[in-house]
Amino acid sequence: MIELLKKIFLVDLFQGLFVTFRNQNPKYIYTEQYPAERPKVAERYRGAPRLNINPDNGETLCISCNLCALACPENLIVVTSERSEVTKRKELVTFTYDTSRCMFCGLCEDACPVDALELTQDFEMASYTREGQIWDRQALEEGPRPTQYKC
């Protein structure tokens, strides 16, 4: 008998509508307007890699020790160097980093003795090709450029 009265008076319908209208209050809405408003990431977030540059002379801080490549469990970092005749030190020739295979563990960053390589808080690394995911030295020094959307 009670079930029949509930069906007649549409109790279930009104309970559902009550829940819907109760959650229409703007203070309960958690939608982010992503392209217009960039989300804040956690302080310890590890995102896009970057090769740091010495601000005094504009050269890279990398000393070509290859420790980052050895520490990487995915073997995605390739460092090549040459010994300079003038300074008798190793100089960085190429530095490639495959972001498509990276799991952003931070082991390469921890292994670097001069803090030349760091994982930034940038998270927009999408590209249309696989070749766009392989960053060379110049791309790593510049860092990712966030896409500018027109709103």
Swiss-Prot record:
Top-level division of the source organism's lineage: Bacteria
What is the UniProt remark on how the cofactor binds and its stoichiometry?
A: Binds 2 [4Fe-4S] clusters per subunit.
Its required cofactor(s), as named, are:
[4Fe-4S] cluster
Query: Which cellular component appears as one GO term in the record?
Result: plasma membrane
SUPFAM superfamilies according to UniProt: 4Fe-4S ferredoxins
Indicate where this protein resides in the cell: Cell inner membrane
Function per UniProt: NDH-1 shuttles electrons from NADH, via FMN and iron-sulfur (Fe-S) centers, to quinones in the respiratory chain. The immediate electron acceptor for the enzyme in this species is believed to be ubiquinone. Couples the redox reaction to proton translocation (for every two electrons transferred, four hydrogen ions are translocated across the cytoplasmic membrane), and thus conserves the redox energy in a proton gradient.
NCBIfam families per the record? Answer: NuoI
Could you identify this protein by its name?
NADH-quinone oxidoreductase subunit I 2
What lineage does UniProt assign to this protein's organism?
Bacteria, Pseudomonadati, Acidobacteriota, Terriglobia, Bryobacterales
